[in-house]
Amino acid sequence: LTGVKFDTRRITFSSNINDVVKESDTLIFVTPSPYLKAHLKKLKTKIKDKFIITAIKGIVPDDNVIVSEYFTKEYGVPPENIAVLAGPCHAEEVALERLSYLTIACPDKDKARIFARRLGSSFIKTSVSDDVAGIEYSSVLKNVYAIAAGICSGLKYGDNFQAVLISNAIQEMNRFLNTVHPLNRNVDESVYLGDLLVTGYSNFSRNRTFGTMIGKGYSVKSAQIEMEMIAEGYYGTKCIKEINKHHHVNMPILDAVYNICLLYTS
């Protein structure tokens, strides 16, 4: 967001997480998932009575749990006090005030609606859902599939092939969600399919960029160094692979990304 000007008079900056938590009723977490645990180690203030919103598109490594479950398990935050913010919403376009649609998921839909009203604006439209786990898992998987799309791009596969790839990716996502968290959901909604499409195709997508570099022959480490940004899908691939050992869902695209990025590319 280096090209965006912010009104710093309306922003309070702090490097002390405990000071921020003490003064806030609602906490929004956007820390990349690989660093969440280390970041929270500094936390001494109880958060179980706070309203937690996570915009993290990853799974907590080692624990292999989605972020909402981690806050409940480790910090005693009731599920009804945790919401997930998701959807096709690249920060670059939001900062430029381009029309975007976000979904706020929470077991307590009334709380989701309250936050949705606060978040909404002339260029931010919102909807609410109670599919917290499904949306968190889909937010992880779409990054994995964006890496796959990037790899195909780096290998000079055409648009025809990538269309087939994404078509199969949404089916694979649906199989996984229906197995891990069965619910009457429509994966054609923007928070699932829309987020997958924008992450798989957009030039703003870090995961697609990472995959493109891998497809061009970069090692994982060299791609990460050159990008200077976190591609959550790399870490999410390993976590979902571990989780799927307990569910045995047929996931050939996930397996391909895992084999390329974690087995054969160093």
Q: What are the functions of these language-model segments?
A:
Residues 54, 81-86, 126-130, 188, ...:
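General beta-strand structural signal in soluble alpha/beta enzymes
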Residues 264-265:
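Conserved small/polar residues in nucleotide/adenosyl-binding loops
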Residues 1-4:
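Glycine-rich phosphate-binding loop and adjoining beta1-alpha1-beta2 segment
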Residues 145-146, 151-258:
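Interdomain hinge/lid region at the active-site interface
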